[in-house]
Amino acid sequence: TQSTGTSQTIAVGLWGGPDN
């Protein structure tokens, strides 16, 4: 899951997968 934002990345990571 690619997100353009730190908060977005963390939020998506909860139900998508950690980007960092």
Swiss-Prot record:
Entry's family note: Belongs to the jacalin lectin family.
Additional detail: Two isoforms exist, a major form and a minor form. This is the major form.
Skewed-composition ranges (Polar residues): 1-10
Source species of the chain: Morus nigra (Black mulberry)
GO molecular function, one term: D-mannose binding
Keyword line: IgA-binding protein, Lectin, Mannose-binding
Complex and partners: Tetramer of four alpha chains associated with two or four beta chains.
Protein name: Agglutinin beta-2 chain isoform 1
High-level lineage: Eukaryota, Viridiplantae, Streptophyta, Embryophyta, Tracheophyta
Role, per record: Alpha-methyl-D-mannoside and D-mannose specific lectin. Binds IgA.
Keyword Electron transport among UniProt keywords: no
Region (Disordered): 1-20
